Amino acid sequence: LRRQRQMCIRDRYDAGRIEQLNILQRWMTNDSTKSLQAPIGIDTNGMPIVLDIHEKAHGPHGLIAGSTGSGKSEFIITYILSLAVNYHPNDVSMILIDYKGGGLAGAFQKGDVKLPHIVGTITNIDKAGLQRSLVSIQSELRRRQVKFNQAREKTDEGTIDIYKYQKLYHDGIVKEPIPHLLIICDEFAELKQQQPDFMDELISVARIGRSLGVHLILATQKPAGVVNDQIRSNSRFGICLKVQDRQDSIDVIKRPDAADLKRVGQFYIQVGNNEYFALGQSAWAGASYEPSDIIKKKVDTSMKFVSNIGSVIKKVDDTLK
């Protein structure tokens, strides 16, 4: 697969410079109790596609798949950056599990500077190290349960979940922020094969931690045979880039279409029982940073006839004046 020119993530925000992203303003205005939308690309009409892991939208858990060269790693990086642009670290945080050490965790740190939303990384560690990491995650769940119980007693609320707690924090009623916690696990198929107990416990953590703001996103190159009923029942959304065969696609989006994708970064997103299904092209976070006060947009006035997998069948130039 050859990478075609893709939309840079800054283009998605009409930003020629980092400052033009208006990140602080976004952090102040975006309400994580109502939505966790993050742009991930554009559809075949050039309209934005967003992933919203809010409980009442596409969330809380999901699957991402893509074979080598599909753009899966870039897609995950773009999604993480999109969340970071739109939500304060007090509202959204992340733990990255990069079992093969593919560089996902390192993409968000340069020297002593790192993305403030990343609260932990787990990479290239043995069984004992994985167990310690699991204990830390379980300890965080217990801490959240204690804080939620304290908030319930303070407010006489019948129940407290992550959305109610964050509203109490935003309103100044509770003092300690508790962000949504995304556990993003890349190459989970290999982790499941080599450390099955850890993987089972991680899925259990996600199930128990649902009301506590824990989200589990599992990514792999080869989903066929490793997406079992437990994983499938806990995954509300599936995103599939180019995969090797039809069964890989079926295991993620319940249809074989992603095996026929052609372009790097092209993907299908499927939510629930086909509540939402779309073909998209992801934004690209790997472009070199060239600051500009002028946002250059190339307007394509041609008409393209495409197949159901996004391949251009015919292109007609607009010659009308």
Indicate residue ranges for each PLM-predicted region.
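P-loop NTPase catalytic phosphate-binding loop
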Residues: R3-Q4, I18-T159, D171-D251, A259-D260, ...
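Disordered, acidic interdomain junction associated with two-component signaling
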Residues: Y163-L168
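Conserved small/polar residues in nucleotide/adenosyl-binding loops
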Residues: R2-R12
